[in-house]
Structures are given as C-alpha cells and as structure tokens.
C-alpha cells in the first residue's frame, strides 16, 4: 500500500549466491503482477507460491498497522467542481438559446448537451485525482483505488466528483446528468434516473451470465477431445503473424503475439550474419524482441490450425502452456482450456460493464487546448468550412497545418494533423486551457449507424415553412412520405389556440370572425331516427355528464297466453314459460339481456323426439333443411316431413379383447353381460369391432334373423327400407316399415329385419304461436322453429336415449330495424315482456376536446311524449372558453375540422419609429436579432400588423430541419402542443459494450445464417463459399477446400479477437484457433466417385483426401463451416453428442447405423466411468490409441516414437527438479 518499498531479489535460483538488486518502484497492483510474473519465469512455481505467500503476510502486516478504513471525511470534493458545473450550465444555456431561435437542430442540441456534460465529467474526474495528489496522497480512498486494492477511478469520481450522464432502459442517453455525487447525496429526480441504469445492470447481468455459461458449455463440448497426443506432427505449414491493428492504432503487438509460439521458419539476422532462431524453436520474450527487430510482420509460426495430428494437436503446433511458460505437456486437455479461456471472460465482462450502473462512457475526440493566453494565427489555405456535430460553423484541415498562439512574452506552436476541426477563428484571442481544436478520428463505416430523433411541438399553433422544400418519397413499406430537401430549412409554429371538431358539427362562425368568451361556437343535434316514446334510464339522466343516454321506446310486446315461473336449486336457476296448453319452454336468455334478430330465446321441453338408444337417422324425400347452426348445434328445418330412426345400441369399450363375454354375430337377449360390469339393454344381433387385440366397440342391432331360400335374391336389398305391405322375400309381407341388412353368421349368410321408428317433423308455420299484445308498432314477433339434430344417414354411436329434433322460440325483428336494441323482461309469476329501444348516447368526447370548451346540453322534447322519426330530442351547445380572432385551415381533413383562435396572449407589440422602413407584413423575426439599430427582438415571431410607430408580432417558434428529415406536418397545418412535427435522420457512432459483444461472439461461433429472421450479410457460410470459388479457380479443386478453410480460419480468429479486444480482454490466439479448427474440419460430399460415400454426407477433410489418393475417380466435395452446437452433434463420439443435446435422436441414429464409439475424448470416458485420456491417464490410453492407429494404414501419418517421449519426460523431470524449494 505504501508509496515506496525497497525490495531485494536474488537474480539466480542458486541459493548459495545471493546476488541482490534494488527495485525502487511504487508497488501498486500492476507492479506486483509484473514482479510475480518475473519471479515465476526465473524461479518456478513452488518458489513463487512461497514468495507470494510472504508478500501476503507483509501486506496484511502493514494493512493492520495502517488500519485504513473509509470515513465520510475522507471523501473530499475538489473545490473546482462548482465553477466546472457553472461553466457547463452556461454553455448549455447558450446551446438552448441557439436551439430556440432555430440556429441548430434538436439532434445538434442533444449532442452538444451530451458532449458538454461528458467533457465536464471527464475534466472533473482528472481534477479529483489531482486534488487527492496535491492535498493528501495518503487518503484511504485514493490509496485503495490507485493501488488496485479496491475500486477504480470511475467509482471514486462518482463518490466525490459527479455521477454524470446515465442511460434510460432503452439504452438512450438521458440529457439531464446527475450533477451530485454520493458524498453530497442525490436529489429525488437524480435518484430515479440513477435507478434506471442500476436495474438494467442487474437484469442484464443475470441474463448475460446465463448466456456466457451456456457459451462455455457448448465450447467445452466441441473441443473436449482436443488433447496433446504427440510431440511433432511433422507439418511444414504454419500461419503468418503480424500486429493486430484497429485503424492506425496497434491493439495487440507482434511481440506479444509471438511469445509462446513455435517458429515454422528459420530467422536470419543480416546484421549478425547468422540465424538467431531456428525452425521448431519456441519463442521466449527476449527472442520475440530480437525477431521483431529483424522482421516487423508476417512471421511464419506453427499453429493448431495447420497441425497434421488427427483429432488432436501436437506439442510444437500448440507451443507454450500459458500456465507455466514452457512447452505444453503431453496429455494436456488443451480443448477444455481453450473453451474456458473464451467462455469465462464473457461472464467477467458481463459483470464489469455494469459495475458503474449504466453510466455513459462515450469515446471523446482528442482535444487540443491552448497552453497560454494570446492571439491565434493559422493559414486558411488548406481549410474548408464545415458544420460540426454541435451545429457550429468551424474549419476542417485538409492537410497538416501549423497553429501559432502569440502571447505577451512567448509563442506557442503546434502542428495539427489532417481532419482536425478548428473551433476558433483565425486572429481571435484565446485564454489558457481553452479548447481550440479537436482531432477527429477517421470514421469507420462499421462504427457508424443511422439513427433518428423525433421532434415534438412545444406549443399549439399554425405551421409555416421558411426555405423548406419538400420531396415526396416512398418508404420501405410503400407509403408516401415528405422528406426535407438537400439543404433543409426552418419550420415555424405561429402561436394560437387550436380546436378540433368532428365533421358533422355545424360551426356558428367563419374565418376572421371575432369570438367572445361564453359565445356559442357550434351546435350538435341529437336526433331520433326511428321514433317512439322518449324515456330516461332508471337513474335520472344527467345531461351534464359526458356519457349520458336517451332511450326511445320503438315498440313493445307482451305474451298474454303464457306466464313465467322461476325454478331455483343448489346447482342452477332457470325461468320456465308455460302456455295455456301447459306446454313448457325453457328460457335461454336472462332478464334485461340485449338480444339480436333471429336469436333463440326459449326451447320447448318435450319427450316427443327422444329415442331409447343410438341408431341411424334417415330423412324422407320431402324434408328440406338449412345449413348447420353452430349455436343450436342442429339443422333448421325449411320444410317438414317424416324422419326414420333405425335403433341400435353402441358400447364404446377400448379394452383388451380377451375380456369380451359375447361372440361376434351372436344373437343376445336384453340384460346379457358384454364385458364385466357392462350389460346390453336391447335384444338383437351383437357385432364386435376390434383392432390389434383391442376391443373398440360392440353394437347391438335389434330385429329378426331370417335365412332366405335363395340368398342371391336379397343381395340388392342390403341397407334398404321396405314399406308396410311390400314383400321382403320368399312371400313374406312387411306389416310395418322395416330396414333390411345382410349379415354373415357363423352358420352362413342371413337377412336381419330391423324395426324402424317414424317421427313427424311439421313445418314451422304449423307450430302453435304464442299470442301477443302490442304497444306502438308491430315491429317484433316471436316465431317457433323446429331443428333436426343430425344430418341424413348419420349413425349415432350411443347406448342411452338421444334427442333427434328440437323446437325453439326465436325473435324476429323487421329488417330496417336490425340496428336497434331489444331487451327481455323476465318477471316471476308474470308475463314475458319484450321491448325495442333506440339508444342515443350523448358522447361529447367524440364531438369536441373538453380542455378548450364548455358545453351545455338541453332537452327540447318532454319525457313519455311520442315522437316521429327525424325529431330533434336534445341540443348540445359548445361554448367558447377563450376569445379572439378565428383562423380556419384551408385543408380538408378526413376525420376532423380544425380552427385556431388567436388573441392578445399570442401577440406582442413593439414600439418602433419608422416601422415601415424596417418591416414588411409577413416578415419572420428571430429572438435576440437586431431588428432596428439598438433594439433586439425580445421574442421570435411573424409581423402581422404595421403602423407608423408600432409593430405587432404573432409569437412563433422556429425549428431547424436538417436535410433528408421526414416531416409529419405540412405548410398551413394546425398542431397542438406535443404533436410530432418531424423525424430528424443523423449518423451516430455505435457504442460497443458486451451487450453487443456476447451475441456477436455467439453469431460467429455458431456460424449463424440469419439474425431476427433476416439473412445475415457476409455470414461465414457465404464467405467460405466465395473463398472456395476463388481458390478453385486459382489452385484447382483438390487444394481449394484446404486453402478456403485457411482463409476462413484466420478471418474467424481475428473477428473473435476484435470483439474481445474492444472490451480490453486479452485471450491468446491459440485458444480461439483450437475451437476454430473444430468448426472447420469437415467437408460435405457432392459426388461420391469411387468411394463408398453418399452425397450430403459430412466427413473430415483429411479422411476424404486420403480416400481420394487410393481411388481412380475422386469424390467431389465442398468445405462447410459448422457452428459449435452442430459440430458437437456431428462429432465421431455418439456418447459425447448424446450427452450434449437431442439425446434420443443421437442414440437412435447411432443404433440404426451400428456405430462404434472409440472413447477418444474426455467426456465419453467420464460417462462410462473410465480413466480419462489426459494428464496421468494419458499414457495408458496412448498405448491403446497407438495400437488402434497402427491397424489403420489408410491415414499414412507418422506418430512420435518412444525416444521422443523419453526426451520430453526427461525435460519435464528437469523442470520439476528445479521447482523444489528448501525453506
């Protein structure tokens, strides 16, 4: 924690020669990290662990002595904060003024406000640090944050500086910053804004942590079988390494990238005239520096991407194990290490992004400030004027220019690069520390996105365009829209109170009329269309209510030959209508319900159409029915007749056939047991239906069995009806209507003569009608109607009684009155009453806008009076709350008519001598502009009246509209406060953080084709195909797959790295290379040639290359990239694939194909409980693996010999010996 420590280290690991050196540095977190790394490299892990342990004890000892803790007095706020905030507020007030007079657009104002607060926040952050250093370097807050023990600069600045700008839940920056810090305490508004970001942080952290964890799981699954299995695969190829750059800035130097790699070429030094490094030599930090002195870029190194080992990586292609800075050991599970290295920062980043709770951190342009007071001089030759993003006019340099600031005693010279924005005019006076220029970074097309901002009206009034030309364009959806022209212009709102009426309200005034407060502006009549008796609701009509009703009784009927009774029990209640013949009707609607034309209101209770069992229904030829009615679940009868019912008893069983107690086609008596606990209710022929030993149903068909002398004579009588008196066969005459059916019995074929029951279906007109007494008109009636429940020929599967026809009572309304409402009054022990009303709602909200008017509604007719159609019942007068001159819009709107009232509140009078010299009618005046010598305009407005010594302005507000903006209003329109005027289109830099980072990583590693149902441009599949097409032309089809894979692999590695680098996270390339190797190892067969492969099959590239060497007609194939999920499911091991996803599918497929799992990976061995083939278990597996490989000669690959293994083991033994420590 202290400022300075004397630390002594022995340079060699030899314990006897204790050569010490003095390390005179401030020991903060970074320095301790460097020391530990150096110690680890020079002294091994055991000694380092011991040293770190002693460092810990030393740290705790001094921490205990110091007793550092945080008290509220330690949070000292820099005094400069007050004037920094005052400066920012002055700058923003100036910006707001410019916006209100139409000098800058809403977007420019917003960006200026954001940038002002951001730079204030940054400046204050630096002031905080300086203040601590100058006043109290031993301040606990300062020591904790800057030693790296706890907290960071951002958190300290929020404690004692200002919290700064925050984002809202949509990620947009709120232009109201949090000026306070936590020491001073937040205001209520600031606290609420602050909570936005904190809540968003918590939710996002939870979601991203899950995403990151799942990413790690998929990566582990895809790479778990990547193990270092041999020393050298013998490859001659490698990849070219150079520094990683973001625009001009080096993000990842070549020195760093080379450390831990193995060279694939010899490096020759022309100065020393000798090789300083040889092929297959691993690169240490010192060697990396030497190589970079000779070659700046394109150094050929070995890589897991080009390793020839099958389903593994060799030691030399992998390079160092980053854990201990030596060549990786045999049996190291590098796949799992790679997966964790890529997946883990996802979680970490997720946490890190949101620690500050959504504080906005944008990238600020490099600023150039004057170091002295003086006069600024520069050449204007290589500059052109431009509008900055803050709407200010500035100069931008087209080449490097020199700026000179001439002070009283000295000069200050600075050379600024191309694309520098000069914010101060040539020859102006500048103060020390004043911002004079900003160096703008070259804009990358990918870092810019098109954004939009809506501008709403600040007050109501009339739209007026100044120098604003419109172009009519079509949107992406084909809608027409107005776009501002190339140069934009000004959109003015001329003040006035805007009123809107519905179209059918007649206005009582005209344009240019003067309206007085309390005068009638419009009158709305409430008219009865149908006539009748005017009534009110039960609660008396309150006319001043905005939603009141008037009722006009159009007609009323009362049933006189029937009365209502109310039945109620524990389960339900119902109304029964009983007529003078004691026929009962079950009411289907409740009291006071509104009913429609043709609606069923009651059902006739009768047993006339009940059957004993199920059966077959047949219509006679006279019957005609309408289409099926869903409400009544029946067919309305248009014309009556007879329906025939052939009874049969059906039992649906669905049980095992062995339970059946009767035989198929056996005649059974009523009461016979069919299966246990199930008896038949009718006598007849039993027919059994079963499938696959499951008993489906048993049908009992009543009737008599007759065996004809000659069965062929009755074949054509199967399923026919025989009328009474007709011959059945062999001279037998039918006594009544019967149904014939041929049946096959065990003793031979026979005829089943089945009984038929007939039901009479009358016409609806023949049914008895209820008698009614009418009041007013006969516009409504109750009509009986009969419905058949089943269609002709339908078989009804049932054993209990069924209803085959129903009689209903339905309401009929005259066709011209269908819009009217009909209600039923059900009164117990009284008559049924039906009334038809015309409801007239006084909905004043539809007619007018209440904020602007008063209204008075008067009844012009008395209640209970009869009125004829078209009579006015009430009048609503709309009374003006304001006074003033009326202006009407020339435009016809589809829904509303609008007008505007302008009074003295919308005007301002200026006393000016000789007004005619300076003004003309219609002139537009900007606030703050000199209108006559010595007089500035106090408000913006339009000249509407001129007299010799006075000018009347109509107050107005200008809005600057940029080019290509989309306008939602037109010249002359009336708008209210808050209406959207225009959508400004602008470019903004994309803000990068892990919220975009993790999905991008997933998009790359899963090789996504689409995003949000839209195809992804430049997705990996399209890129690979284009690389393959190029390579085929250049190298031929045999080499094309390999070459296109190499290109895609490098692209993928760089893309993944760029996402992590943007977050400041360091991941070694080799980890990403291991994963990418797994994604790009397979090809898809297009033509099998002489191989046994089928088109569409996926196979590893090295296998198909070996196969093609041994056949005359080569197989054709194309490279494919598999996402990590697909690669996991397409792995050689089905046990591993099944444990990942789609277990049943993977195992079923493996079983059908008779697959063998060779248990090469870690996962499959863990699952079946064997020793894993990594670490200590490697040698056991390696012997078996080598034996497996020696059996398959087709692969043609040389594996490492035992002598190489011994050499490596000896080398490792040496390292381990070095690591022993004697305390």
Curated annotation (Swiss-Prot):
Subcellular location: Plastid, Chloroplast
GO molecular function, one term: DNA binding
Names of the cofactor(s): Zn(2+)
Classification via Pfam families: RNA_pol_Rpb1_4, RNA_pol_Rpb1_5
Annotated positions binding Zn(2+): 233, 307, 314, 317
Annotated EC: 2.7.7.6
Quaternary organization: In plastids the minimal PEP RNA polymerase catalytic core is composed of four subunits: alpha, beta, beta', and beta''. When a (nuclear-encoded) sigma factor is associated with the core the holoenzyme is formed, which can initiate transcription.
EC class of the enzyme, as a word: transferase
Protein task: DNA-dependent RNA polymerase catalyzes the transcription of DNA into RNA using the four ribonucleoside triphosphates as substrates.
Organism whose genome encodes this protein: Mesostigma viride (Green alga)
Recorded coiled-coil stretches: none
Name by which UniProt lists this protein: DNA-directed RNA polymerase subunit beta''
GO BP terms, alphabetized: DNA-templated transcription
Family matches, as PANTHER family: DNA-DIRECTED RNA POLYMERASE, DNA-DIRECTED RNA POLYMERASE SUBUNIT BETA
Family named by the database record: Belongs to the RNA polymerase beta' chain family. RpoC2 subfamily.
One GO location term (cellular component): DNA-directed RNA polymerase complex
Catalytic activity annotation: RNA(n) + a ribonucleoside 5'-triphosphate = RNA(n+1) + diphosphate
Cofactor binding summary note: Binds 1 Zn(2+) ion per subunit.
UniProt keyword list: Chloroplast, DNA-directed RNA polymerase, Metal-binding, Nucleotidyltransferase, Plastid, Transcription, Transferase, Zinc
Family annotation (Gene3D superfamilies): 1.10.132.30, 1.10.150.390, 1.10.1790.20, RNA polymerase Rpb1, domain 3 (1.10.274.100)
Keyword Cell cycle: no
UniProt key word Metal-binding: yes
Lineage: superkingdom: Eukaryota
